[in-house]
Amino acid sequence: MAAAAAAMATATSATAAPPLRIRDAARRTRRRGHVRCAVASGAAEAPAAPGARVSADCVVVGGGISGLCTAQALATKHGVGDVLVTEARARPGGNITTAERAGEGYLWEEGPNSFQPSDPVLTMAVDSGLKDDLVFGDPNAPRFVLWEGKLRPVPSKPGDLPFFDLMSIPGKLRAGLGALGVRAPPPGREESVEDFVRRNLGAEVFERLIEPFCSGVYAGDPSKLSMKAAFGKVWRLEDTGGSIIGGTIKTIQERGKNPKPPRDPRLPTPKGQTVASFRKGLTMLPDAITSRLGSKVKLSWKLTSITKSDNKGYALVYETPEGVVSVQAKTVVMTIPSYVASDILRPLSSDAADALSIFYYPPVAAVTVSYPKEAIRKECLIDGELQGFGQLHPRSQGVETLGTIYSSSLFPNRAPAGRVLLLNYIGGSTNTGIVSKTESELVEAVDRDLRKMLINPKAVDPLVLGVRVWPQAIPQFLIGHLDHLEAAKSALGKGGYDGLFLGGNYVAGVALGRCVEGAYESASQISDYLTKYAYK
């Protein structure tokens, strides 16, 4: 049960729409200096790199983490160096946004906060020259869920199950029996996350563990999220093994029969189940890849059209700071959000465009605040310190905030001595009204929630460091998601648009790590296509 819950709660969002500027408003919270607010899309254009390219083996549309990693994977794993990455905005990295007040000792994230240090992500980091900049969280740091007014630790391993108080004894027994297969059989249709978890593990696991994890990972509604699409690894356990435990045993047996190849000796070995970042924040990764790719990355290049060329490949037309530029490409991979890809692809295939337009991205706001250490409630301290990854809030518990990450506890050098840094997420599928709130209203909502369980009600007002609203933040893997994605790919194939690939988080998954893994998968597909068709 603990393993299943953990597997469903490990993702971190990785791409989003450009943020929305929040109008300045009078705030009741005390502030020092400049508050970093959201920046509207269409930042000042950067000049194109000298020596504009007019052709490429592969054009990567989108300079977020998926696109940049695809380009680097093509070069490092497949020897495909004739690649062009085009980004409409003036900076690379998508919604990876690290902010800093260097003089005051604050460093924080306004998009994704961390990643699971899987081997593909570590490989990308090492290949980008960032091995020595990796930082890892404490694998023993607790995670908390708010329940009945109290922050309760979440079990991190099966041995913790008898001792944690988030669930009742009957709830634990129900979960254990369900995991063993004593539960109703699958219904023969695509299940929502809620239906799957309630059927397999019971109401308590869903309401007290999985529902808040869905809010924290997807900012989504678990009654609408597809179990198969959103948490496929756990779904496959039952599908292949007859039950969650049966599938786990079968997976272990299969691994024994098919051992992994030797691990790359260059990669560091994280201790336990943890998360990671970089010394100066997540933005170090896209910046490092961009630096290595050099003039192959074009910023402020807005794609206006794409057409199939008569001599194979594709012709792409861009508006750039230096005028209109046409690019001829043997292959194209679109790593932009699905709703942007839909508009661009509509002249090629209305069926593909229609399928891509279905995917939903709810709004999410990231609100970063700091309190003095003494503002933390004593009962929330461990050995006199705020320790842990953070906390999640079930929608049933009467708070608006989805969850809070203890940024200053998770990684070093994120806040000055004597201060705690908290990154709070608010909004999502069940609270879309945040886009109409002012900056001060969002801060007040976060501060009000924190004073219910973590912050002393009489503590001083927080120092507000950043408020960033992502109007279209995280793609929702709803029931039917995989069918819609397959429909889009099939429509492109039937239309004769071979060599045109779809990528990004709505394809690979919302976690930053899945975006990197998906980039390696896309690079392999592109390389195979070039070898079989385009190079002949």
From Swiss-Prot:
Compositional bias ranges of the Basic and acidic residues kind: 252-266
Record key words, sorted: Chlorophyll biosynthesis, Chloroplast, FAD, Flavoprotein, Heme biosynthesis, Oxidoreductase, Plastid, Porphyrin biosynthesis, Transit peptide
Superkingdom as given in the UniProt entry: Eukaryota
Localization, UniProt: Plastid, Chloroplast
Pathway: Porphyrin-containing compound metabolism; protoporphyrin-IX biosynthesis; protoporphyrin-IX from protoporphyrinogen-IX: step 1/1; Porphyrin-containing compound metabolism; chlorophyll biosynthesis
Cofactor details (free text): Binds 1 FAD per subunit.
SUPFAM superfamilies hit by this protein: FAD-linked reductases, C-terminal domain, FAD/NAD(P)-binding domain
Range of the transit peptide: 1-36
UniProt-recorded Gene Ontology molecular function terms: flavin adenine dinucleotide binding; oxygen-dependent protoporphyrinogen oxidase activity
GO biological process, one term: protoporphyrinogen IX biosynthetic process
Enzyme nomenclature, EC number: 1.3.3.4
Entry's Gene Ontology cellular component terms: chloroplast
Entry-linked InterPro entries: Amino_oxidase, FAD/NAD-bd_sf, Protoporphyrinogen_oxidase, Zeta_carotene_desat/Oxidored
Catalytic activity line of the entry: protoporphyrinogen IX + 3 O2 = protoporphyrin IX + 3 H2O2
UniProt region (Disordered), positions on chain: 248-272
List of residues binding FAD: 62-67, 87-88, 111-114, 510-512
Cited function: Catalyzes the 6-electron oxidation of protoporphyrinogen-IX to form protoporphyrin-IX.
Name of this chain's protein: Protoporphyrinogen oxidase, chloroplastic
Taxonomy of the source species: Eukaryota, Viridiplantae, Streptophyta, Embryophyta, Tracheophyta
